[in-house]
């Protein structure tokens, strides 16, 4: 309601309320939800910006200011005082955690980003960058894969928002078949983690697909 009030009668602004659904914030999913049009694999889309990016563009254009600070959410069971903090870009992650009250002794991992697409940090001396939006402090170690072999149950295919075939992509990455990876549109994978989340064997699907994308890039050089 506040956004609608701020937009007023401006014909160039339309406020659309969408249901909370992961990963609806991704570019292609957002276009489908708002316009009803599906973006074909490999096709280009229009320019989409989140609120933070729009704010940064406004400051750059009207005030001549670069991105110098970020709002970072410190959260998770391992965080002593979960909170949002305004952080200077370049600040080491360990200093951000200390400022936010530190972490508990049982914290085993700090993830930069969210629980589904975040990346575990092996070194907390690395700096906050313009893409840093959250620090997730975890106390439970990730369960290891029960069996490295895919049982081809198909749950990953049902979960994939891009309509890909994770079970086949997993196999072709492991055998290095670039032709099949290209045919099955591996590059359309957004690494959302939905497939890994539902996998009963806890296979490292996202990590495998990242390696597969590197394999395809190397083949294009």
Model region roles, listed by residue range:
Residues 1-6, 120-127, 200:
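Short glycine/threonine-rich loop-to-helix capping motif typified by GTGT followed
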Residues 1-93, 99-106, 114:
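Hydrophobic alpha-helical positions that pack around
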Residues 18, 75-77, 88, 111-113, ...:
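Generic beta-strand/beta-sheet core signal
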Residues 21-25, 30-37, 101-151:
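Active-site gating/interface segments in enzymes
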Residues 48-56, 69, 80, 88-91, ...:
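Conserved active-site and cofactor/substrate-binding residues in soluble primary-metabolism enzymes
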Residues 64, 70-72, 120-134, 159-160, ...:
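A glycine-rich, aromatic-flanked flexible loop/lid motif
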Residues 73, 84-86, 95, 111, ...:
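Structured core elements
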């Amino acid at each position: 309601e506040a956004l609608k009030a701020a937009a007023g009668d401006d014909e160039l602004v339309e406020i659309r309320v969408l249901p909370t659904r992961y990963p609806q914030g991704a570019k292609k999913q957002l276009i489908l939800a708002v316009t009803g049009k599906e973006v074909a694999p490999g096709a280009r889309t229009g320019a989409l910006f989140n609120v933070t990016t729009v704010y940064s563009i406004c400051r750059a254009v009207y005030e001549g200011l670069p991105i110098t600070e970020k709002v970072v959410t410190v959260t998770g069971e391992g965080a002593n005082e979960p909170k949002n903090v305004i952080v200077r870009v370049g600040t080491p992650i360990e200093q951000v955690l200390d400022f936010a009250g530190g972490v508990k002794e049982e914290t085993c991992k700090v993830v930069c980003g969210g629980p589904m697409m975040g990346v575990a940090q092996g070194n907390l001396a690395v700096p906050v960058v313009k893409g840093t939006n959250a620090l997730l402090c975890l106390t439970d170690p990730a369960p290891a894969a029960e069996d490295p072999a895919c049982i081809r149950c198909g749950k990953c295919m049902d979960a994939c928002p891009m309509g890909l075939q994770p079970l086949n992509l997993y196999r072709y990455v492991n055998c290095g078949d670039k032709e099949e990876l290209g045919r099955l549109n591996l590059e359309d994978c957004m690494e959302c983690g939905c497939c890994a989340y539902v996998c009963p064997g806890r296979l490292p699907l996202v990590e495998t697909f990242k390696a597969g994308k590197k394999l395809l890039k190397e083949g294009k050089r």
